[in-house]
Design a protein with these regions (language model features):
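Acidic, mature catalytic/reactive cores of soluble proteins
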Residues: 1-425
């Protein structure tokens, strides 16, 4: 009898959610509402972001990447400001905690969370231009603290080189978002200079340069250094093979990791891109051919040795696949930004991208965690959803992506949305 009651509750909830998904609500409105479930109150009354349901806690990197889409672009500016200021006050020696604990003993084990903080401040400024005074008072000191510690070699496992780029970690560490460990060793060793760390660091320095100009603090200007860094970046990371040109995934003294991964997108997509514009088309062409799927981007090209087509098996096997081909929807935000940057025919590019990702919105929202976006999908078709059934940065970056595409080509977007809701093309 108890089973029937539970079955009935389940059936009613499925109907309710399907009804919501079929309502007249816009996709942006729907994702904005879905995003609210990731904003949770901490015991001390502050707001935090849960990375995913049902088993993830609150992580610095995920919080910062998800924050704009969950708050600034979802009509929750106060909540977003609240979380961002809270994170800023948790900075210790230039580091944002990557794992938060209730007792205040946070773990500071990532090389990039602090650099994503700078990006989140940029997103706040873009969405809420009237917050410049708040940024000057509360965020600018944090950004300076981060740059001072990273650039001064005062962050564990992070060493600046003579050209101003950062080398992070050693063969036993995993300090980037591709942080899976199987049998005690990193599955995707990325020590050295991972391409997105170089892009994020350059973006942070360039943003600080523009704030220093705006706030009249010339000692924080870096214009000459930034020009030099762009040419060093190009020399280090640019790879040419028989299929065209793209960016290496990691540069280290003594060679580059030339496997095709999506991290190169951040050199094009961040507010201050480290790669020059005339190089965008070839990078995007390689990423589109090898990594783009209807549900997100593969973490590794299928032709690479070590590519895992399916996320399956025991914990070790799944960890082996986690960043070795598995598809992540959150990367669509960076991909969409890069596409818009490179586009000469904006409506055409928006139409093509929307057509590609239609299944994510037309089918997946009624699947897995109904109404939400999963953490990951298999690298090979049919790209079954896996991992958390509702992932903060998946929902957030999909919302930010739709916002950007709608802003760039409103007519194309409106037509696509109407069709996606009907289940057409």
């Amino acid at each position: 009898h108890g089973h029937n009651v539970i079955g009935e509750i389940w059936r009613r909830e499925v109907e309710r959610r399907m009804g919501l998904a079929a309502s007249s609500e816009s996709l942006e409105g729907h994702l904005a509402r879905e995003g609210e479930r990731f904003l949770v109150r901490r015991p001390d009354g502050g707001l935090a972001v849960t990375a995913g349901y049902h088993w993830f806690g609150s992580w610095g990197r995920d919080t910062l990447i998800a924050l704009p889409g969950l708050t600034f672009y979802a009509g929750r500016p106060e909540e977003g400001t609240d979380v961002l200021l809270g994170l800023g006050s948790a900075v210790r020696d230039g580091l944002i905690p990557n794992v938060f604990s209730a007792d205040g003993n946070h773990a500071y084990n990532s090389a990039d969370a602090s650099l994503w903080y700078v990006w989140a401040v940029q997103q706040m400024l873009k969405a809420l231009p009237d917050r410049k005074g708040l940024i000057r008072e509360r965020c600018w000191p944090v950004i300076k603290n981060i740059i001072e510690h990273y650039g001064g070699g005062k962050v564990p496992f992070v060493a600046p080189d003579a050209e101003g780029f950062l080398s992070v970690g050693n063969p036993g560490t995993q300090l980037t978002w591709m942080d899976a460990v199987a049998n005690g060793r990193p599955v995707t060793p990325r020590h050295g200079q991972p391409v997105e760390i170089s892009a994020l660091w350059y973006n942070a320095l360039a943003f600080a340069d523009s704030l220093a100009k705006a706030f009249g603090e010339p000692e924080w200007r870096r214009t000459k250094q930034l020009d030099a860094m762009r040419s060093v970046f190009f020399k280090r990371y640019w790879v040419t093979d028989e299929r065209g040109d793209y960016l290496a995934d990691v540069w280290r003294d003594g060679g580059v990791e030339t496997c095709v991964r999506p991290n190169q997108l951040f050199a094009l997509s961040l507010p201050y891109p480290v790669l020059d514009e005339e190089r965008y088309a070839s990078v995007l062409s390689r990423v589109r051919r090898c990594l783009l799927t209807p549900y997100g981007l593969r973490t590794l090209a299928p032709s690479a040795p070590g590519y895992r087509p399916l996320y399956e098996g025991g914990p070790a096997e799944r960890d082996e696949a986690y960043h070795q081909g598995t598809v992540w929807p959150w990367l669509l935000g960076a991909y969409g930004e890069a596409v818009l940057r490179a586009a000469w025919d904006v409506p055409g590019s928006v139409r093509e991208l929307l057509r590609t990702i239609r299944p994510l919105f037309a089918q997946h929202l009624g699947d897995a965690g109904i109404g939400s976006v999963s953490e990951i999908f298999d690298g090979d078709p049919p790209h079954l959803p896996n991992g958390c059934i509702a992932q903060a940065w998946s929902v957030a970056e999909c919302l930010r992506l739709l916002h950007l595409l709608k802003e760039a080509a409103p007519g194309v977007y409106a037509e696509w949305e109407a069709n996606a809701r009907k289940g057409g093309n």
